[in-house]
Amino acid sequence: MNSLAWRKGKNVGMTLLLAIFTLAVLIPLVLIFVHIIKMGFSSINFDFFVQIPRPTGETGGGMANGLAGSAMLIFLASLFGIPVGIFGAIYLSEYGGGSFSNLIRFSADVLSGIPSIITGMVAYTLLVVPMKGFSALAGAFALALIMIPIVLRTTEEQLKLVPGTLREASLALGVPLWRTTLKVTLRSALTGVMTGILLAIARIAGETAPLLFTALGNQFWSRNLTEPIAAMPLQIFSFAISPYDDWHRLAWAGALVLVTIMFGLSLAARYFGRRRQQGN
């Protein structure tokens, strides 16, 4: 009897301990969200999405150029980062083997763990200095370097989950290996691959440090990929450290919009991940 009571008490104690640790994670997150909504919601209006920041001393304005700039940077980074990550994962999963593949995996893991500011410094050396100026292309390249290892490792793991019998059945019908990989293996893992892509986009959407060394920022519309471009994280950083209350309000509004976008991307990633589990 004493042994049974002890086991029940230990079970209740561990349950309470886990609940405390869970609350320790959730409470700060909820407080951050509540504070951002409290500070930024009042500044969200139509002008915020269609106007650029106004000069010092003038009220109103918005972050339309930052929204467009972030969308452009993410699009350009995805054009380079997603294909490289996916085809690299296909090589590792379907064709690779031995020390070279292990070297690629190790390099991807190291790259994903490098502070993003170092990635920005590398992009600055490789693109900004030779081009003699900050640009959207340099910013997109820096974000692509962050994106590639996430897409690569996620896609590789998803491809490994595809049953080998599907590959064997396709090959037995005389389908070439490359066609089997693209039409059977990759298609079967598509929902999982989408999860990795969305997580990578959510990661780079909020990056600020690499853009300070590459895109720099712009108070106006950018019409050339070889000139500095505005981005939401850069504008939030710039407005938050300014001494002007109007810019502080814009910074909080921008933070709310950016957090909402990242939250939506995370929910979409979870949706595709759940579809993948249900498919299995």
Language-model features: locations:
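C-terminal transmembrane helix and the adjacent membrane-cytosol boundary/short C-terminal tail
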Residues: 13-14, 156-160, 195-198, 238-280
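Short membrane-interfacial helix/loop motifs at transmembrane-helix boundaries
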Residues: 27-60, 216-226
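Interhelical loop and adjacent transmembrane-helix boundary motif
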Residues: 56-57, 211-259
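Transmembrane alpha-helix signature in integral membrane proteins
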Residues: 61-91
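Cytoplasmic-entry segments and transmembrane alpha-helices of multi-pass inner-membrane transporters
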Residues: 84-123, 150-157, 279-280
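Short helix-to-coil transition segments within interhelical loops
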Residues: 95, 159-165, 169-189
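Generic hydrophobic transmembrane alpha-helix motif, especially the helices
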Residues: 109-145
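Transmembrane alpha-helices
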Residues: 175-214
